[in-house]
């Protein structure tokens, strides 16, 4: 931010960039800079070596234009980071300020080597002003972030390390010394200036540098120049230290985040496909190196910001799972400890197992080569605690992919180790024998039509075989859960009233397989999908209405992996469309105060938030938005196959936690609603149980969106 003046005709002075003023042997800086740059490149190569150890296949070389745009939006615009108002914006200020200062330093270097006539006059004043202001915002940002971490101490930052403090101090020192240098230069310039115009240029170009200059006004010019030189070299030394430390500290996230933004999963929310499963020699992930390169990059990208932890329903109800610590950070520590032995085995051609017997490994306090990823590092409790709600992935500013890692480890536990909760084994058996996790005889799958008195409204394809526009995929809950059969009835009546042409497969419909897949039984999942695809294709299905959000996610996002490409809609999307088109006109607005629970699989997994709300408002519902709604919604506890697993209330660290569904129900009951409305059979079951546990059954009823709309139609 140093500029001088040269006289022009007419006596005017024009500001211009003067680099290296008052700095003898300034050229040495370019030689010294080779040291930190070399250290940085060495560190980057060591990171790359570790990522290349990955055995799993992850392909992220498609949609190049979209990836470049993602890199820009989330890296430079900080779109995901600023979701958290205070910390997010302070981080954005720090990033933008550092970025502009880095670019300015690069321009300085270029200006010093080649003539750059544009860095003078009004353009240069504007350039200097932008650098000065954004640099000061960065200084504010780092101070606020330090205050939050060390004085406010939010729970999400409960694993602060000593290195975090040193990094904050280093960044603070770089920024502060930069302004001291600028202030000293301006203070000296003021004393040496002969015109008010020159002083006016200084004030306009560097408002905060001018502020710092006021601190040094009483010093002599010689003292100013001496301190300017000393601080300049100190500033460059700590800046070079910063560069050298990047690959070896959490500063690495500056570059790792850019890679993660570029190579993030651009496909709709879906689990990873296992191709040629019958030929596979192993299933899932047993060792850290079995993951894909993007998974290992994820581990290096985590900055321990705690947003995943803050939003995780399992963590917030006292479970073993902490997506930040017991999952990502434990895996990262394990990878860091194991990588040297894996690299040595790769270099020598030795078997990985042999490295466990080396003297170096044996001398470790905990031999990383003998640690089990599933049992010692992550822990089976952590693996089974996850509800797949996607809150961690939704709020992670680095786009770390937590759920795929959990599911891969479950696959190994289930399909390779044969180690799973007994309730999961029972659900698998039920799905294998009767094609539904309830275990009710498959022959009665269409029985709900007669039970609810809507048989004549349904085109039962195996019997009627009429032409239809949509296939109604009712799912297991409508078929076998007594409470949810009423939802199926309401939906059928609404579709008929609107004149929608639809067919239903009855006993030729099978479980969607979502629970099987998310519990780790990929083979069973693919078997169920194959059976459904055969039925769909036999009847020429093109469009599908799905009742359950879990089935909706499977059919829409995951069935295409096996060739099942259809137009898939959740029923709330169809109802919202019918209401908007005037084909469903509620005649008896309810006028009821209600809270709405966002299903994780309809909301975070698929981005469907507004359509269910529009239906409820059309029905005359007074929808009260609670704090944890939409992207910030709290899981009911049944996702990820946990509908079929027992959950106990946890006593931990002297705190008695409630179950996930009870915790969520308490949130929904805060506004004292007359109704709690869901869009999912699992959610309805869990919230209804929560209302019962809260002894609020008399004052608050639990309904599904379809039921609410039908009530307003009757």
Curated annotation (Swiss-Prot):
The chain crosses the membrane at residues 25-45, 87-107, 125-145, 164-184, 207-227, 236-256. Pathway: Lipid metabolism; butanoate metabolism. It is found in: Cell membrane. GO terms for molecular function: 4 iron, 4 sulfur cluster binding; metal ion binding; oxidoreductase activity. Keywords: 4Fe-4S, Cell membrane, Fatty acid metabolism, Iron, Iron-sulfur, Lipid metabolism, Membrane, Metal-binding, Oxidoreductase, Repeat, Transmembrane, Transmembrane helix. Its EC number is 1.18.-.-. Binds 2 [4Fe-4S] clusters per subunit. Its cofactor is [4Fe-4S] cluster. [4Fe-4S] cluster 1 binds at residues 302, 305, 308, 396. The keyword Repeat applies. GO terms for biological process: butyrate metabolic process. The keyword Transmembrane applies. It is a multi-pass membrane protein. SUPFAM superfamilies: alpha-helical ferredoxin (SSF46548), Respiratory nitrate reductase 1 gamma chain (SSF103501). Its main location: membrane. [4Fe-4S] cluster 2 binds at residues 312, 386, 389, 392. One of its GO terms (cellular component) is plasma membrane. Induction: Highly expressed during syntrophic growth with butyrate (at protein level). Seems to be constitutively expressed. Residues 293-324, 375-405 form the 4Fe-4S ferredoxin-type domain. Might constitute a membrane-associated complex with EtfA (Swol_0697), EtfB (Swol_0696), and the butyryl-CoA dehydrogenase Swol_1933 and/or Swol_2052. Oxidoreductase involved in syntrophic growth of S.wolfei with butyrate. Is presumed to link the electron flow from butyryl-CoA dehydrogenases to the membrane, in conjunction with the electron transfer flavoprotein EtfAB. May transfer electrons to the menaquinone pool of the membrane. PANTHER family: IRON-SULFUR-BINDING OXIDOREDUCTASE FADF-RELATED (PTHR43255:SF1), IRON-SULFUR-BINDING OXIDOREDUCTASE FADF-RELATED-RELATED (PTHR43255). This is EtfAB:quinone oxidoreductase. It comes from Syntrophomonas wolfei subsp. wolfei (strain DSM 2245B / Goettingen).
């Amino acid at each position: 931010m140093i500029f001088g003046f040269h006289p022009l005709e007419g006596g005017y002075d024009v500001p211009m960039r003067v680099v290296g003023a008052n700095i003898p042997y300034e050229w040495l800086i370019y030689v010294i800079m080779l040291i930190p740059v070399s250290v940085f490149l060495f560190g980057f190569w060591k990171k790359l070596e570790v990522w290349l150890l990955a055995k799993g296949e992850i392909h992220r070389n498609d949609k190049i234009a979209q990836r470049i745009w993602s890199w820009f939006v989330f890296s430079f615009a900080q779109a995901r980071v600023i979701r958290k108002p205070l910390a997010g914006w302070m981080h954005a200020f720090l990033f933008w300020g550092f970025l502009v200062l880095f670019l300015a330093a690069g321009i300085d270097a270029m200006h010093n080597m080649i003539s750059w006539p544009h860095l003078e006059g009004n353009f240069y004043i504007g350039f200097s002003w932008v650098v000065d202001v954004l640099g000061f915002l960065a200084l504010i940002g780092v101070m606020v972030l330090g205050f939050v971490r060390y004085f406010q101490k939010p729970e999400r930052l409960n694993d602060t390390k000593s290195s975090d403090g040193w990094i904050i101090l280093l960044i603070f020192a770089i920024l502060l010394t930069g302004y001291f240098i600028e202030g000293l230069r301006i203070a000296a310039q003021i004393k040496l200036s002969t015109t008010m115009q020159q002083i006016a240029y200084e004030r306009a170009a560097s408002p905060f540098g001018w502020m710092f200059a006021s601190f040094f006004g009483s010093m002599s010019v010689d003292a100013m120049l001496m301190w300017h030189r000393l601080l300049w070299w100190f500033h460059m030394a700590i800046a070079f230290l910063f560069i050298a430390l990047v690959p070896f500290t959490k500063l690495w996230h500056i570059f790792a985040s850019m890679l993660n933004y570029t190579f993030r999963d651009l496909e709709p929310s879906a689990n990873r496909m296992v191709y040629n499963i019958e030929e596979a020699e192993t299933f899932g992930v047993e060792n850290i190196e079995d993951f894909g390169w993007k998974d290992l990059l994820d581990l290096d990208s985590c900055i321990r910001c705690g947003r995943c932890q803050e939003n995780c329903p399992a963590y917030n109800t006292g479970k073993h799972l902490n997506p930040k610590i017991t999952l990502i950070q434990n895996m990262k520590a394990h990878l860091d400890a194991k990588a040297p032995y894996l690299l040595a085995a790769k270099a020598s051609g030795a078997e990985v197992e042999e490295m466990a017997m080396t003297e170096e490994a044996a001398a470790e306090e905990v031999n990383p080569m003998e640690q089990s990823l599933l049992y010692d590092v992550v822990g089976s409790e952590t693996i089974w605690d996850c509800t797949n709600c996607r809150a961690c992935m939704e709020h992670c500013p680095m786009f770390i992919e937590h759920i795929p890692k959990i599911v891969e480890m479950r696959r190994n536990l289930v399909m390779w180790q044969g180690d799973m909760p007994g309730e999961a084994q029972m659900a698998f058996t039920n799905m294998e024998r009767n094609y539904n996790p309830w275990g009710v005889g498959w022959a009665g799958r269409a029985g709900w039509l007669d039970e609810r008195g809507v048989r004549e409204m349904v085109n039962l394809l195996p019997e009627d075989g009429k032409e239809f526009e949509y296939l109604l995929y009712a799912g297991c809950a409508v078929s076998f859960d007594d409470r949810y059969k009423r939802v199926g009835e309401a939906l059928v009546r609404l579709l008929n009233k609107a004149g929608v042409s639809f067919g239903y497969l009855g006993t030729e419909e099978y479980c969607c397989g979502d629970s099987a897949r998310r519990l780790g039984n990929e083979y069973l999942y693919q078997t169920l999908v194959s059976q459904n695809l055969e039925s769909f294709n036999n009847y020429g299905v093109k469009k599908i209405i799905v009742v359950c959000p879990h089935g909706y996610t499977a059919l829409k996002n995951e069935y295409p992996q096996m060739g099942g490409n259809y137009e898939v809609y959740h029923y709330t999307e169809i109802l919202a469309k019918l209401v908007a088109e005037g084909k469903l006109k509620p005649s008896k607005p309810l006028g009821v105060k209600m809270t709405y629970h966002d299903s994780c699989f309809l909301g975070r997994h698929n981005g469907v938030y507004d359509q269910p709300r529009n239906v409820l408002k059309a029905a005359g519902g007074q929808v009260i938005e609670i704090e944890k709604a939409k992207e910030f919604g709290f899981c009911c506890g049944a996702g990820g196959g946990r509908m079929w697993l027992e959950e106990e209330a946890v006593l931990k660290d002297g705190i008695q936690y409630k179950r996930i569904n009870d915790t969520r129900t308490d949130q929904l009951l805060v506004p004292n609603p007359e109704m709690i409305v869901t869009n999912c059979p699992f959610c309805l079951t869990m919230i209804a149980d929560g209302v019962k546990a809260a002894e609020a059954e008399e004052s608050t009823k639990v309904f599904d969106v379809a039921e609410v709309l039908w009530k307003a139609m009757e």
